[in-house]
Amino acid sequence: LTSGLQRSDLIIVAGRPSMGKTAFALNVAQNAALKGATICIFSLEMSREQLVRRMLCANAGVDMQRVNTGNTTDADLIELSTALADLSATNIYIDDTAGVSVAEIRSRCRKQKSRGGLDLIVIDYLKLMKTAGNSDNRATEISDVTRSLKILARELNVPIILLSQLSRGPESRTSNGHRPIMADLRESGAIEQDADVIMLLYRPAVYAEAGDVEAENDNTMEVIVAKHRNGPTDTVYLSWLEQYTKFTDRSDREEY
């Protein structure tokens, strides 16, 4: 739908908690890296070890719960070893500095660009980023961050994926099944203005009523492309494999 990740684009991936924002971004980054791209990931919430574990399980098709609890099988270890070899051959650089600023991201990405090239930047996530200023107005801070990142994307000629959390708006919106809209973006004005692409993630199972087994087991992920500066908006349907923290394509598209 978006014709791949376009250079110099600022791409916002947003959703409520537990929608799979980090997993989605890691899947995109990992797929690009396995095709030869050089990726810089800035994780302000999760550690490098946690991200690597997620990527390994997604690539190996191994249940992450078994890895976390130390209950892996011999077959799991073989798959994980193969996945580790594949990932070790990629150019994925993870920076898990807490509270990293836009200025620090700019400096590190410039160095990587000049040293060994750079094809994609992923930042997880917007709320935890610091700005150079000392504004008490969060909307102003968000505006500074998104504008600076858009400038950086153009300067380095690479796409930047920025994760963001949505407000509680979808929780009370029952008429459309709690699907998010752009207005649910926190401090949405600045984000809408600076972003080239805005993707809103939605999983119906998160809002399933207790006891509705079919709804609870629905693994559909809707990627709602709410803004696309250079193309159409639409919804892309994926399958969410929670045990592997992985998304896969699906051939069927369900109307709602």
Model regions and ranges:
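Conserved ATPase-coupling elements of RecA-like P-loop NTPase cores
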Residues: 130-137
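Conserved glycine(s) of the Walker
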Residues: 20
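Pre-Walker A adenine-sensing motif
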Residues: 1-4
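C-terminal regions of RecA-like/P-loop NTPase motor modules
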Residues: 101-118, 135, 144-157, 169-256
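Cytosolic-facing regulatory segments adjacent to core modules
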Residues: 23, 27, 31-117, 131, ...
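Pre-Walker A (Motif I) flank of P-loop NTPase domains
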Residues: 6-11, 37
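The Walker A (P-loop) glycine that initiates the GxxxxGKT/S ATP-binding motif of P-loop NTPases
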Residues: 15
